[in-house]
Every structure is written in C-alpha cells, then in structure tokens.
A protein has these predicted regions:
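C-terminal trimerization/auto-chaperone modules of long, extracellular attachment fibers and adhesins
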Residues: 386-389
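Bacterial Sec-dependent N-terminal signal peptides
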Residues: 1-23
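Residue-level detector of functionally pivotal "anchor" positions at catalytic/ligand-binding pockets or at interdomain
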Residues: 361-384
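Extracellular Ig-like/FN3 beta-sandwich strand-entry sites
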Residues: 393-395
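C-terminal tail/sorting-segment detector
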Residues: 3, 397-404
Length: 404
C-alpha cells in the first residue's frame, strides 16, 4: 500500500510539472489599451499582459496600417529586453504605414542576425524622425525592398553597419524619403543586387547622391532610380555597369536641377524600355548619347519630354522607334539638330541626325553638320535673268537648294 501511494504521488507530481516543461517562450506584440504603443516580447507571460495581444510568426502583422488605411494611433514602439533572445526570420512590414509613429525604443534588443526578409519594415512611417540602426544586423537579408519608403521626416540614416552582401533586391529602398539630405552608401556591397528600381525616387531634398560605391554588374532594373530627385545638381555615374540592364524608363525623370549627365560609360545593349528617361529634366542643356545602342529598345514614349532647356542631343545613329508618334520630344522647345524643333513633329521619327533632332559628333568630339542639309547651289543667273553655268564677275543671282 505504501509503495502504491508513493507511485501515485510521483505520478501526480510528474503530471503537474509537464505543462511547465512543455511551455516554450513565444514572440508576440501587445498593443496598449489606448492604442498608442506597441511592445515586442519573447517570454511566457503572454496570458498576463494587458492590451491586445498579436501574433508575430506566420501572419501579416495585425497592428499595422494597410495600403488604403494607415494606422494613425501608434506613436511609440518598444522592443522589450526579453526580445533579445528571439531570432525573427522576417520583419516584413512590422511598422508598415504606422504614419504617426515617432519613436522606436530598444532597437538594441532586436536581433536580426537570422532575418532574410525586411521588405517594407519601416515603410510609411511618415512621422519618424530618427532610427538607431547601429546594432542592426543585415548579414542574412536578401530582400530589403521598400524598407524606408515614405519615411518622410527622416533627415539622416546611419547605414555604416549595413551588410548587404546577400541582398538581391533594393527597389524603392529610400523612395519618397523627402527630408533626407544625404546618404553614405560606402558600406554597401551590391554585387548580387538585381533590382534597383526607384531606389532613390522622390528623395527631393538631396543635392548629391554618391553612388560610386554601388556595384551594378548584376542589376537588370534601374527604372525610376533617381526619379523625382528634384534638387539633385550632379551625379557621378562613371562606375555604373549597365551591361545587364533592361529597364531605364523614368530613370532621371523630374531631376529638375540637373544641368548635365555624363552617360559615356553606359551600355544600353539590352535596354528595352526608355520611356520618360529624361522627362521633365528642365535644366538639361546637352545630352551625349553617342554610345547608346537602342537596337533592342522597343519603347521611347516621352523620353525627352518637357526638357525645356535642352538644345543639343549628340547621337550619330538613327533610332528605330516602333511608335513614330510617341511624343518623344514633346516640349523640347529649344532643341535643334539637323532641323530646328517643330511642336507638330515630336515623335520618334525625329530621332535621327539626318532629318531629325539629333546632332552628329565626330570622333574628336566636334559636332558636325549633316552634309545632306548644307545648302548647295542649284542655279546661277545674271542680273538680266540669263541662266549661267558658273559664277561670273559682278552681280549674280543664285538659287540655293534650301530655297533661298
């Protein structure tokens, strides 16, 4: 009987301890009762927390805003010290469209050493004025698309600790960061990056962007890369490798302060889309496109549209534009090549140096006039109206090939 009692006691104790042993720490977010604060935890206390508890793993974050409805309540976010032990595989949209968020505390408690996807993490945080990324580990990240997009109040970002060695996609990374004045990208390793579309689009406060550190040998998409950088006054693209790029549409669209762009190193052999590439570059006066190969390009819509100060486009080739009425030169009022600009002739048919708006450039860099459009003598007459075979001493009446 004593043995049986002892056995039952041990069994009861074992059963009592099983739930405790079976429990595992869990990562979760608590939204405060008034909705103004979210806290990230990794512990066993989820059932005891006050507020709305949200899951992190395997779900779209329940606390964030949506594309059509931002979260305008959350003002503060904090990573609790317990969160140090958690290793998220993705931080996808963790603060997406939290448009009133002003502060993120405890970033040192966020361990991203195993995080591969950081898409849209801070996108739409329009009130956020600073981010402490000094402990941020991006060594495993392969996708950082939209990460800081529309962080409209950020004036600076310290990215010196960013390891981008495995990143393949950076599209919209800093898009619409309207207050950013500068970026130091010297720590960026972009040898594996394939997409940089709209990477700096809408960075309207930057006067200069140093992209000489960017390795673009694998990049195929540069669509809208600098679009809307309206204060950008200069850019050094001498290190850009564009051999694999297929999309350059809207690449410099709206760069209203640029007066020149050196594209002498650009290879456009595989580029298919150049729509709006220089659209609304209002202060560009000259473009040298003599190195451009457009044999595979199929779309040129509004390529030079509204370049109001553009007077010369150097190019020795006739471009084959599938749509001859694509408004390629619309609004280029000062443009003159083989012929002067005509507002009624703005399509791709004018993309040539023979009868269009391109200007030939010789190997020594000197612009040459198209010989077929140099006026020649068609007929010679004496003062009395008699037709002559050659110019005579005295008064001659000469009829030229251009009608003069």
């Amino acid at each position: 009987m004593k043995v049986l009692f002892t056995f039952l006691a041990v069994a009861i104790m074992t059963m009592a301890t099983l739930p405790l042993k079976a429990q595992q720490k869990e990562a979760y977010v608590v939204v405060s009762n008034n909705g103004t604060m979210i806290t990230f935890y990794y512990d066993l206390q989820k059932a005891n927390r006050e507020g709305t508890v949200c899951q992190i793993e395997g779900t779209s974050p329940a606390w964030i805003g949506t594309l059509t409805k931002p979260n305008t309540q959350i003002v503060t976010a904090e990573f609790d010290k317990s969160f140090q032990e958690y290793r998220p595989k993705r931080t996808w949209r963790w603060f997406f469209n939290c448009s009133a968020l002003k502060e993120i505390k405890g970033m040192e408690n966020l361990n991203t050493s195993e995080t591969t996807e950081m898409v849209g993490m801070f996108s739409g945080c329009k009130a956020l004025t600073s981010l402490n990324l000094s402990k941020f580990d991006t060594s495993m990240a392969d996708n950082i698309n939209n990460m800081f997009m529309e962080c409209e109040a950020l004036t600076s970002l310290d990215l010196s600790n960013f390891n981008t060695e495995k990143v393949t996609s950076m599209s919209y990374l800093f898009a619409s960061c309207k207050a950013l004045e500068s970026l130091n990208l010297s720590s960026f390793n972009t040898k594996n990056v394939r997409t940089m579309g709209d990477m700096f689009a809408g960075c309207a406060n930057m006067t200069k962007i140093d992209v000489t550190f960017l390795n673009t040998e694998s990049v195929s998409d540069m669509k809208g890369m600098f679009s809307g950088c309206s204060k950008l006054t200069s850019i050094d693209l001498s290190k850009f490798n564009t051999e694999r790029v297929s999309r350059m549409n809207a690449m410099f669209k709206g760069c209203k302060s640029l007066t020149s762009i050196d594209l002498s190193t650009f290879k456009t052999t595989y580029v298919r889309n150049m729509d709006e590439m220089f659209f609304d570059c209002q202060n560009l006066t000259t473009l040298d496109l003599t190195k451009f190969d457009t044999r595979k390009t199929t779309s040129f819509d509004d390529m030079f549209g509204q370049c109001k100060e553009l007077n010369t486009i150097y190019c020795n080739d006739k471009w084959n534009c599938p749509d001859p009425n694509n408004k390629m030169f619309d609004g280029c009022e000062k443009l003159k090549g083989a012929v002067a600009y005509n507002k009624n002739s703005t399509g791709g048919v004018m993309a040539n140096p023979e009868t269009g708006y391109f200007t030939r450039k010789t190997s020594d860099g000197i612009a040459s006039q198209t010989t077929s459009h140099i006026a020649t003598i068609k007929a010679i007459y004496s003062a009395s109206g008699q037709k002559l075979n050659e110019l005579q001493r005295g008064l001659n009446i000469v009829r030229m090939s251009d009608g003069t």
